[in-house]
């Protein structure tokens, strides 16, 4: 090896090795002080890129876990509000069951409806005011996406539905609305109600007064209806003519009638005080005028004495063919029982509803007048109309009954099948609550999975970028020793050119 002064190759070699050990020592100290194996891309370019992607995933998944917890909070808030809505619906159902009981008075129903209305208004208030972080969760249909992953599209959707009185089908829910008026309602709810029912017996039509029961013909100028005394048929005649008995007439008979000759013959052949029978009647000879047949006979009818006078038979006449007969009273045969009567007519009884029914009369519609207005009722009396519109009975604020038509009643009439309506509303609330409960369980599962993923990613990133202290301490010790050795050797290498000077002495 040449002895030179200008170039100290040993020193240069030693310096180079010393720089290497210095770099190794610097790297080891940096890793030990930071705890990271990769402090910059130069430490491990590929590893740094991989670790950075892991960091992005870890941070994204950690935030996603917080998002999922927010999703649980939203679901819990919504479900809590729905629970209160459910409680109100249950109370409304309880009140509706009470309202359907027929023992309730009008004031009872009003009190029940007042509480139902308050409960329904509370449902709307809960719907409008329940919110999470400024978002109203029940006031409208909405789909809320919760980011539960570190990448696009990794979401879980919470289906929020509008839940209020209208969406539950309970808008206008009423258990104390107007009810269809009946004839019975009109009679019991109003004063001075008048009118009539119509009946038809064949081609004949009749009216029956709803208050007095009087029967008249169904006409513009109605006639009173009677029951015929002879045959029980309906008639407008108030009496039936009885049959006059020829034997008893106050007008003198024609000469030689059978009755006159028979009575004259009895007088002629008898004496005063004798009795005889004729046509089922027993007569007594009161007066005998001569022996020609003239005279008077009497009998008792219905407790009254009736005298028959025979006259106009000539004195010494050979027969009684010229006899005439005259009664002190007119006597008739009753058309009802065939008995003798002094009445020329038998009075017919006024017809009643039972008489119409006995004649197979069929009931038709009715005309009912309330407060000056005439209403029409159907044959069964359970439907009242005016100008073709069904009438309902309603109550004013002071509790006074009033009649309104179907148009006015539509907005306030009682809900048909109220219990079924509430059950439907409860089912809808239950369905939404079930959905929210399921989504909470899903979020719990997502949070658990995110936690596992973050743990595994942290472990993977640690293996790439975290410093292995055992290795790095060993590297630092090695570098320190090399530094010490290099420094010492460099000092000796720097002394080598001094040896060349010895050649110059």
UniProtKB/Swiss-Prot annotation:
Name this protein carries in UniProt: Phase 1 flagellin
| Keywords, ordered alphabetically | Bacterial flagellum, Secreted
Provide the function of this protein. Answer: Flagellin is the subunit protein which polymerizes to form the filaments of bacterial flagella.
Q: What else is known?
A: Individual Salmonella serotypes usually alternate between the production of 2 antigenic forms of flagella, termed phase 1 and phase 2, each specified by separate structural genes.
Which Gene3D superfamilies does its entry note? Answer: 6.10.280.190, f41 fragment of flagellin, C-terminal domain, f41 fragment of flagellin, middle domain, f41 fragment of flagellin, N-terminal domain, Flagellar export chaperone, C-terminal domain
Where's it found, cell-wise?
A: Secreted; Bacterial flagellum
Q: Which GO terms describe its molecular function?
A: structural molecule activity
Which domain of life does the protein's organism represent? Answer: Bacteria
**UniProt main location, coarse:** secreted
| An annotated GO cellular component | extracellular region
Which InterPro entries does the UniProt record give? Answer: Flagellin, Flagellin_C, Flagellin_C_sub2, Flagellin_N
Q: Which organism is it from?
A: Salmonella naestved
Family of the protein in this entry: Belongs to the bacterial flagellin family.
| Residue ranges of coiled coil | none
Q: Which Pfam families match?
A: Flagellin_C, Flagellin_N, FliC-like_3rd
Keyword Secreted attributed? yes
